[in-house]
A protein has these predicted regions:
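Positively charged n-region of N-terminal signal peptides that target proteins for export
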Residues: 1-11
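Hydrophobic membrane-insertion alpha-helices, especially the h-region
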Residues: 11-26
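Short N-terminal edge-element motif at the start of the domain
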Residues: 24-38
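N-terminal secretory signal peptides
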Residues: 36-84
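A short, sequence-level motif marking secondary-structure junctions
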Residues: 47-50, 74, 86, 125-127, ...
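Short, surface-exposed beta-strand-loop junctions and turns on beta-sheet-rich folds
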Residues: 62, 86-88, 116-117
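An acidic-aromatic
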Residues: 68-110
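Mature, soluble, non-transmembrane domains
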Residues: 94, 98-171
Length: 171
């Protein structure tokens, strides 16, 4: 009985230290997670600073050519600034209202798209070579995770992420 009381005090103290640490360091972060077999795995975490660059590279599933999407984090959400691609096709921007279109270095480029996206949800696919570059670091997700793996990229506080991990759901 005495041992259980000591153990509970230790658990309480450790929990209190963790929660205090999270409150003190509760800076907004960008999380990249991969869901495998119902378990969320953290792939990367970076400080959610304004103008943080994010690049998504993949092979278009229909055209079988490279696509590069360039985004930046504005402090609250992601802004799709530019899309570069090698061939026109389904799902690729082409209308005047999509932005400013031009050709450069063998790529079709749609600049000044300025589309806001709060959270990104991607999937690894057969032959798509899904890769992201976040704050200068490259993650070849297609090499790390099986085909069909859900990849989420979103801003959240460390404290909120801690409680999601404990409770098991977003609130």
């Amino acid at each position: 009985m005495r041992y259980e009381g000591i153990l509970m005090k230790k658990i309480f103290i450790v929990t209190l230290i963790i929660v205090t640490f999270l409150f003190v360091t509760n800076q907004e972060k960008i999380f990249v997670t991969a869901e495998v077999d119902g378990v969320e795995n953290i792939v990367a975490t970076v400080d959610a600073k304004k103008n943080l660059p994010l690049e998504i590279n993949f092979i278009h599933s229909v055209q079988k050519t490279p696509v590069i999407e360039e985004l930046e984090f504005d402090g609250e959400k992601f802004i799709l600034r530019r899309t570069k691609y090698k061939s026109h096709g389904v799902g690729l921007p082409f209308m005047e209202s999509d932005g400013n279109f031009h050709e450069e270095g063998g790529y079709f480029i749609m600049d000044d798209m300025n589309r806001t996206i709060e959270n990104l949800s991607l999937r690894t696919g057969v032959g798509t070579n899904l890769t992201i570059k976040l704050d200068g670091e490259e993650f070849k997700l297609y090499e790390e995770f099986p085909t069909g793996t859900k990849i989420d990229i979103y801003p959240s506080s460390s404290l909120k992420k801690f409680f999601i991990a404990i409770i098991g759901r977003n609130f």
